[in-house]
Amino acid sequence: ALTAQINPHFLYNSLSIINWMAIKSRQKEISRVTLALSTFYRTALSKGADMVTVENCIRNIEAYLEIQLIMHDNDFKVEWSVDSSVQQELVPKLALQPIVENALEHGLDVKEEGEKILRLSFFEEAGDVVIRVEDNGMGMEQAEKLLTYQAKGYGLKNVNDRMCILYGEDYAIRILSKVGQGTRVDMRIPKEVKKDET
């Protein structure tokens, strides 16, 4: 795996030097991106574990979105809803990032009018942890097809395949999309599953 090939100490030391240089030259935006990138990789690599806590997953996505907000000149808003009862539950590492990236690239980036909103929710429902990503972007027709074939620029099939292998077909990703209104993606993880401690 790629994460096994990365020397994290070199990466973190390099980012620390870049951050120090940015602070020294009063480049706040560069410092902000560098810190977010450092947090993103720290939480993504997660000491080689395949499973991470919801809390760690959130830190990873917060760092990712910090970078995206800078890249997008803060042209979208992020709303969070996190049920504290699920924060220590385990979820597959890096499963959420492709879904969030999809919402930005294929939902909000193509929305031409009105406020752009990305909503992330983490809650318990029927004994499962539910992670929901919603955007008020353009929406799409036949969104469920994204789960069955490898479309260019869409990482949903890989995430869906991984969820089905880990938890079975009942835990396939669910997509609800309406053209012109936006898209909602739900990922369910059974609460009782504890694979790797983080």
List each model region and its residues.
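Short, charged, solvent-exposed linker or helix-capping segments at domain edges/interfaces
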Residues: 196-198
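Two-component histidine phosphotransfer core
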Residues: 1-176, 182-188, 194
